[in-house]
Amino acid sequence: ISTDEVYGALELTRPAGCESGGGPFGEEFFTEETKYDPHSPYSASKASSDHFVRAYHDTYGMPTLVTNCSNNYGPYQFPEKLIPLFINNIRRGRPLPVYGRGENVRDWLYVEDHARAIDVIFHRGKVADTYNIGGFNEWKNIDLIRVIVKTVDRLLGNPEGASEKLITHVADRAGHDLRYAIDSRKLKDELGWQPSLQFEEGIEKTVRWYLQNQKWMDDITSGEYEKYYQSMYD
């Protein structure tokens, strides 16, 4: 179970300032045939793991499968990740740190759809094959953040847009690739999988879950996590 980051980065060809809305931001997508081109130590380590798994099949005949998925969202995600981080910060009135201009584009998939894809691939996938898992649901970070702000404010009973003042642009992080976008048509055509949840419904479910499980979030974000957060953003 790997990541789309192993493929490197794609060009962003839609005009600057164009809103996301879940549509594609370019004509190119990562396919199972895309050559690996990791740009960070993290993605290089994931690429190495993928090759290690394939080598075990080639050398020892071990039955293997590799999946590469786009960004996940949903319940129980560790709060350092963008969506739970911003939900929690809005709830607590803390700044919403946006790397650079927020123009980086990611494809988002609800976690239960990812789990369902893994189940289908595990039981019906071709041994030693690779399958990409994605939502065809691209969002610029800044546009996604505005959706989160609007949803959280509405569910908390805040005036519309009240928390937008918390958006704070910070220095971009090293090795921050501009665009990832998965082509998962192979998985759809061969095994019949496709996302079942529309993004708007998934975000609503996700925000509601974190707001209804504040103790879970507070327990995790206390202690050492708070030290990590301060080292990253304060």
Language-model features: locations:
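Glycine- and small-residue beta-turn/loop positions that connect adjacent beta-strands
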Residues: I1-S2, Y99
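C-terminal substrate-binding subdomain of Rossmann-fold SDR/epimerase-dehydratase oxidoreductases
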Residues: C18, P84, I90-D234
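Active-site proximal helix/loop that lines the substrate pocket
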Residues: T3-G8, N71-Q77, E103, H123, ...
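Short beta-strands and strand-loop turn motifs
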Residues: V66-C69, Y99-G100
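Hydrophobic alpha-helix immediately C-terminal to the catalytic Tyr-X-X-X-Lys motif of short-chain
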Residues: S48, F52, Y56, F86, ...
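Catalytic helix-loop patch of NAD(P)-dependent Rossmann-fold dehydrogenases
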Residues: E5-V66, Y73, Q77-P79
